[in-house]
From Swiss-Prot:
Name of this chain's protein: Phosphoglycerate kinase
Organism from which the protein derives: Thermococcus onnurineus (strain NA1)
Compartmental location: Cytoplasm
Residues that coordinate or bind ATP: E332, G358, G359, H360, S361
GO MF, one annotated term: ATP binding
Catalytic activity reported: (2R)-3-phosphoglycerate + ATP = (2R)-3-phospho-glyceroyl phosphate + ADP
Family annotation (HAMAP family): Phosphoglyc_kinase
Length: 414
């Protein structure tokens, strides 16, 4: 795959596909984490004298955070100390004319790419290639740099459609992500511990199945709704209130799948031994085998309990490699953040090479100033897809582009 330092960019028109999709509150972007993550790539291209065209999506149609990229332009301008012009167009005449008049070292950001219907659908590369987006913009570009790791599991025109038409190059963030995740997945250092939490239960089950079946993990610790499903699969009852909630989320349908994983790998999947419920607004911990478990019938489980935190901490402190995705509970409420913070702090304090991902996981790491984690991934779904053994469309597109252009391009100094 092409790396950013393989080429020189002075006077070249470069389309940078970033993923600046960010949380929004009251119409304003409230986190610049993804902007900062892609900053080294942008700075390198501008320092080299590229004519830079930035593209990103923001949310999806009909959502409250489905906004224009005008604020994205402001945030980038402030971080870079130079103007990144907001262009209220994607591939229409206005955008194309502005791209043609770019000067070396200048940058623009196109309108929210998902304002174009083509970029909302997932289609194979060949179909993406035939879209208006690709056909209108490709003739104006010299290179495509892709730094949108968080969207690496998606196949859309702006992400993969240009790969056979122009050299598609990994940005610094993409390269860092691929290297860190590959190291964690391929290593033979033991013990290798996976921590699976949060609400993406089906994705987490795929990860568990893949890493256990292929000898890539030695133990899996579970929490969040993933932990709920595995706890039910072990035959424990989590009470009417929690079963009702899980039924609404469609999670009870996944219990059989979790049972099958346990049938094959029972000793290698750990589940919580106690939970914390919201008892009239307070945190009350209940042991899974205690007489107080009647509380599960009336009150929601919002975190793992202290005994589980300690058991997980002991395992993590002795790990050599840790992969974690998703929180242990509803960390947004301080009294139910103990599990997430306790587990992530243990990961940071351990001597292991650690990779942590998932939007909520990242938010909790920054919120509680957790340090010592080797690599904080910008991708949640993309990271889960990677560890579940799926082929990621963007990584496939990088390979296709490399094979097509490796002999035809005059490489810059390394």
């Amino acid at each position: 795959m092409f790396r950013l330092t393989d080429f020189t960019y002075h006077g070249k028109t470069v389309f940078l596909r970033a993923d600046l999709n960010s949380p929004v509150k009251d119409g304003r972007i409230i986190s610049d984490a993804r902007f900062r993550a892609v900053l080294p790539t942008i700075q390198h291209l501008l320092d080299e004298g590229a004519k830079l065209v930035i593209g990103t999506h923001q949310s999806k149609p009909y959502k409250g955070d489905y906004i224009t990229t005008e604020q994205h332009a402001e945030i980038l301008s402030n971080l870079l100390g130079q103007e990144v012009e907001y262009v209220e167009d994607i591939f229409g005449k206005y955008a194309r004319e502005r791209i043609k008049t770019l000067k070396p070292g200048e940058a623009i950001i196109l309108e929210n790419l998902r304002f174009a219907a083509e970029d909302v659908k997932y289609k194979p590369l060949e179909e993406c290639e035939r879209t208006h987006f690709v056909r209108k913009l490709a003739p104006l570009l010299d290179y495509v740099v892709n730094d949108a790791f968080a969207a690496a599991h998606r196949s859309q025109p702006s992400l993969v459609g240009l790969a056979r038409l122009k050299p598609m190059i990994m940005g610094f963030l993409m390269e860092k992500e691929v290297e860190a995740l590959s190291r964690a997945y391929e290593t033979n250092e033991k013990p290798r511990i996976y921590v699976l939490g949060g609400a993406k239960v089906d994705d987490s089950l795929r990860v568990a199945e893949n890493v256990l079946r292929n000898g890539r993990a030695d133990l899996i610790l579970t929490g969040g709704l993933v932990g709920h499903v595995f706890t039910l699969a072990k035959g424990f009852h989590l009470g009417d209130a929690n079963l009702e909630f899980m039924a609404k989320k469609g999670l009870l349908e996944l219990v059989d799948w979790a049972e099958n994983i346990l049938d094959e790998f029972y000793p290698y999947v750990r589940t919580p031994v106690d939970f914390a419920v919201d008892y009239k607004g307070e945190r009350v911990e209940v042991d899974l085998l205690s007489d107080e478990k009647w509380l599960f019938d009336k009150y929601p489980i919002l975190d793992i309990g202290s005994r589980t935190i300690e058991k997980y901490r002991d395992v993590l402190m002795n790990a050599r490699v840790i992969v974690a995705n998703g929180p242990m509970g509803v960390f947004e409420r301080e009294e139910f953040a103990l599990g997430t913070v306790g587990v992530f702090r243990a990961i940071g304090e351990s001597q292991a090479f650690s990779v942590v991902g998932g939007g909520h996981s990242i938010a909790s790491i920054y919120q509680y100033n957790i340090t010592g984690i080797s690599h904080v991934s910008t991708g949640g779904g993309a990271m889960l897809s990677f560890f579940s053994g799926e082929k990621l469309p963007i990584l496939e597109a990088f390979r296709i582009s490399y094979e097509r252009f490796k002999d035809k391009i005059e490489r810059g100094p390394k």
